[in-house]
A protein has these predicted regions:
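Short acidic-hydrophobic, aromatic-tinged amphipathic segments that line or gate anion-handling sites
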Residues: 14-18
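Internal, active-site/partner-interface "lid" segment
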Residues: 19-73
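ATP-dependent carboxylate/acyl-activation modules
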Residues: 1-3, 8-12, 22, 56-61, ...
């Protein structure tokens, strides 16, 4: 209430809700005998209302999604929100203005959820390289979601939002070599994601092939690997915490609306297969088909 009240009276009040504003505000006050310009106070008021709106939307989402009769449950039992509330409020923070969108004539930006799911691409930290583009982020998300679905050491190479090489092996090096051989032509200029710590052996293998990539993603990199990669100043290297947790909901914009669904978290098991052909597949063939089924869900 105090934040809203202060924002309404921005003509004579400066309300600060973002610690990032402290330094520039102090500098302006120092340059203006302790005063802030009206334009600055107006900007702070807009930021304050954005802050309270986000807070209110999170509360509204929670309360709207409560099961009927939730108030009658014991106090110690936390109510469980419904999957699809009657009204949906979304809160995102803009983190980057991108050079352009999917095409060069489109403008674009990247927004991060206020509380992103652990292990999602939005949680990335960039170790080196040029700034990410719209397509870099989209392709990186496709590669990361695919590679983190595997328990065994895995490597996924994505080009134009589709996996062109996916492999698992006893080591990340073996997985990389297999995935590269899947389509060695499309592998160039793509995105590579690993689900384990990348060592110098993997970097050396990439260098031997003169494998040019746009983005390299992994949960971590060894010190030797970081040193070897540092010379590739244009290569974008991202670190993302590994987690197999999926987004609670998936969204797709349509004209004037929003399609919402739960994520495709189904993984077929050999025990659940029904073989209807006269020729029975071998155990290896079944294993290969289960692998293909897991990868197919990430093909656009």
């Amino acid at each position: 209430a105090m934040v809203r009240s202060s924002a309404k009276n921005y003509a004579g009040v400066a309300i600060v809700t973002d610690p990032e504003d402290y330094a520039p505000l102090l500098a302006e006050m120092k340059a203006n005998a302790g005063a802030l310009q009206l334009a600055t106070r107006f900007g702070l008021a807009k930021k304050a209302f954005t802050h309270t709106a986000r807070y209110d939307s999170m509360i509204a989402n929670w309360l709207t999604g409560l099961d009927e009769g939730a108030e009658a449950k014991p106090a110690e039992a936390a109510p469980v929100p419904a999957i699809f509330p009657a009204k949906l409020q979304l809160a995102f923070d803009r983190t980057e203005i991108l050079r352009y969108g999917e095409n060069s004539h489109q403008s674009a930006a990247f927004y991060r959820e206020t509380n992103p799911v652990a292990g999602s691409i939005a949680a990335y930290s960039q170790l080196q390289g040029k700034e990410l583009s719209y397509n870099n982020i989209a392709d990186s998300d496709a590669a990361w979601e695919c590679v983190k679905s595997f328990d065994a050491p895995a490597c996924v190479i994505v080009k134009h939002a589709n996996p062109c090489g996916v492999a698992i092996d006893g080591t990340l090096l073996g997985a990389y070599e297999k995935s590269f051989k899947t389509d060695s032509t499309s592998a160039f200029g793509g995105i590579i994601a690993f689900n384990g710590e990348v060592g110098i052996d993997v970097v050396n293998a990439m260098n031997e092939r003169k494998h040019f990539v746009e983005v390299l993603i992994a949960p971590s990199f060894t010190a030797e690997a970081k040193t070897a990669l540092a010379g590739k100043t244009n290569l974008r290297v991202l670190v993302v915490p590994i987690s197999r947790v999926l987004n609670t909901l998936e969204f797709k914009r349509v004209g004037g609306g929003l399609l919402v669904q739960t994520p495709d978290d189904f993984t077929a098991q050999a025990s659940g297969l029904k073989i209807v052909t006269k020729v029975q597949p071998t155990a290896q063939q079944i294993e290969d088909l289960l692998f293909a089924e897991r990868v197919a869900k990430f093909v656009k």
